[in-house]
Amino acid sequence: MKFGASLIRSMLASFSLTGLMVFGVTAQPLPKPQGPVLLTVSGKIGQRNVGDSAQFDAAMLDALPLSKITTTSPSRDKASTYSGPSLKSILERVNAQGSRFRLKAADRYEIDIPAEDITLFNPVIARRLDGHEMKIRDRGPLLLMYPFDSYPKLQNNIYYARAVWQLQHIVVE
């Protein structure tokens, strides 16, 4: 059976109406982490490498396409460059299927990120700050960063609260 453009558009429209976001279909299996695990993704995902989750070490995160955001933030006086994989690329790698993403930090902070944030603002899961690996004192080793300077509507406490530092876990719901 041939899939025509109209069928694909129809499928995409139905996903949009239900609020469900489907992030990629990756045929290549996700390898197991060889180093310390920096990020775990669980929930509605199609790719797993450890039990019911997808775990990433530094090398696995670095193998994903690099994204950069240069922006100011409430925690820094000057514009800084945050680099690492985009949240979207991680969700694509694990074949995430959900409309809401719960981010959990090392200090037990949790916040939900709507799918619209990912498509509209393309936040980055930064491993590097101004070219240097982020340490715990830099709010690392992982920090979800939004392009605050590129979108003035992000410059408020709602979005500042979504910039999760010491990110460890994403639950796809």
Task: Please describe what each predicted stretch is.
Residues 28-173:
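N-terminal intrinsically disordered, low-complexity segments enriched in P/E/S/T
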Residues 2-15:
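Bacterial N-terminal signal peptides that target proteins for export
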Residues 23-27:
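Sec/Tat signal peptide C-region and signal peptidase I cleavage site
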